[in-house]
């Protein structure tokens, strides 16, 4: 009887381990989907947006004219 239990026990443990991994994946997915509230009228946000836009424009310009 003990042999039978040892043979089925690893499979049961393995299935439980897979369920735990699945739950961990769902928690991680929920964290990624969490909505972040950013104040778009804040001066810091506007300053950051202008900096990002400027860098992007320079990148596009270099991409379009690589000789410069």
From Swiss-Prot:
Region feature (Disordered): 1-45
Biased composition (Basic and acidic residues): 18-31
Chain intervals with Polar residues compositional bias: 1-16
Residues with the Phosphothreonine modification: 8
Domain IQ: 45-68
InterPro entries reported in the protein's UniProt record: Calmodulin_Regulator_PCP4-like
Keywords annotated in UniProt: Phosphoprotein
Family: Belongs to the PCP4 family.
PANTHER family: IG-LIKE DOMAIN-CONTAINING PROTEIN, PURKINJE CELL PROTEIN 4-LIKE PROTEIN 1
Protein name: Purkinje cell protein 4-like protein 1
Species annotation: Homo sapiens
């Amino acid at each position: 009887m003990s042999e039978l239990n040892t043979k089925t026990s690893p499979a049961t443990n393995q299935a439980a381990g897979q369920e735990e991994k699945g739950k961990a994946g769902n928690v991680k997915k929920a964290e990624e989907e969490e909505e972040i509230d950013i104040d778009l009228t804040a001066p810091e946000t506007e300053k950051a947006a202008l900096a990002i836009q400027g860098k992007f424009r320079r990148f596009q310009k270099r991409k379009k004219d690589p000789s410069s």
